[in-house]
């Protein structure tokens, strides 16, 4: 009997991957955790049946959520990551020797433990000495922080279940307060393509836009995420991700990446017309 993983993207669209075997399943206090293995995408990790990470395409997401802000401000020293239980964002951040401290706030300790065991490719740097993992709701954690971080990365699940509070006006306001005077906020911004995800994207952008002087959106193609067309939000008190890109400084680091490069950095902010129109709806 064939086993297939299937994720519903809309009432009329489903996405499927043929599964070789199920490696692990658990119902944690917060959500269902599954690790599956496939020929096409290698091992992959889902929460409540929704795709989080595959070994084959995770590099795209993690390159883009980390290297875009780091190339914009190479002097980032203190970083807060909210979510990111699979460890891929942390892996990319630890490649920067100039970063002094990384606080990672993950609501579900079981996600981290399971990923350490089954996904060492992404979770291999979670025990690095600069990384401090706190098991707490990110919404609560950030309430008590002020002028502490140069970069906040919101590597969250979708805006329901455990990740719901990470898409609220209160949360983004507390992130603003927690950032230093030249701080940067980057978040996964959902997909603009299907109506359900597009609504979440517009809601998040509207809230961030009301707080940060500089607020932009950039994109990447991630094959296993709904529609494949995925957005990220870039918001800052000081740095413009295009005007302030220090390509020479970043390239001099000699970091080998599979997706990100400094030419792509500029190009990824050039959005399709339909996305621009959606974002402009908030201004009308």
Curated annotation (Swiss-Prot):
Pfam families tied to this protein: Spermine_synt_N, Spermine_synth
EC number(s) on file: 2.5.1.16
GO cellular component labels: cytosol
Transferase as UniProt keyword: yes
GO biological process entries: spermidine biosynthetic process
UniProt cross-references to PROSITE patterns, sorted A to Z: PABS_2
A GO molecular-function annotation: spermidine synthase activity
Entry annotation: catalytic residues: 155 (proton acceptor)
Chief localization: cytoplasm
Pathway: Amine and polyamine biosynthesis; spermidine biosynthesis; spermidine from putrescine: step 1/1
Record key words, sorted: Cytoplasm, Polyamine biosynthesis, Spermidine biosynthesis, Transferase
Family: Belongs to the spermidine/spermine synthase family.
Protein's job: Catalyzes the irreversible transfer of a propylamine group from the amino donor S-adenosylmethioninamine (decarboxy-AdoMet) to putrescine (1,4-diaminobutane) to yield spermidine.
Protein name: Polyamine aminopropyltransferase
């Amino acid at each position: 009997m064939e086993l297939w993983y299937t994720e519903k993207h809309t009432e009329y669209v489903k996405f499927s991957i043929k599964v070789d075997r199920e490696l692990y399943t658990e119902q944690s206090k917060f959500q269902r955790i599954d690790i599956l293995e496939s020929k096409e995408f290698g091992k992959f990790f889902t929460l409540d049946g929704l795709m989080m990470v595959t070994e084959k395409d995770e590099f795209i997401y993690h390159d883009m959520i980390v290297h875009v802000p780091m190339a914009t401000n190479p002097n980032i020293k203190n970083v807060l990551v909210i979510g990111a239980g699979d460890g891929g964002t942390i892996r990319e951040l630890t490649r920067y020797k100039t970063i002094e401290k990384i606080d990672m706030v993950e609501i579900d300790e079981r996600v981290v433990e399971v990923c350490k065991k089954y996904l060492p490719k992404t979770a291999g740097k979670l025990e690095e000495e600069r990384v401090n993992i706190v098991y707490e709701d990110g919404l609560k954690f950030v309430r008590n922080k002020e002028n502490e971080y140069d970069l906040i990365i919101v590597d969250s699940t979708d805006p329901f279940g455990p990740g719901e509070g990470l898409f609220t006006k209160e949360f983004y306001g507390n992130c603003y307060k927690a950032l230093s005077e030249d701080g940067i906020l980057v978040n996964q911004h959902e997909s603009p393509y299907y109506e359900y995800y597009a609504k979440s994207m517009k809601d998040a952008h509207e809230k961030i836009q009301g707080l940060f002087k500089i607020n932009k959106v950039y994109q990447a193609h991630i094959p296993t995420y709904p529609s494949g067309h995925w957005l990220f939000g870039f918001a800052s008190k000081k740095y413009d991700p295009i005007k302030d890109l220090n390509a020479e400084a970043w390239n001099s680091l000699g970091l080998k990446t599979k997706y990100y490069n400094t030419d792509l950095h500029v190009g990824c902010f050039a959005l399709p017309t339909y996305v621009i129109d959606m974002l402009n709806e908030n201004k009308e």
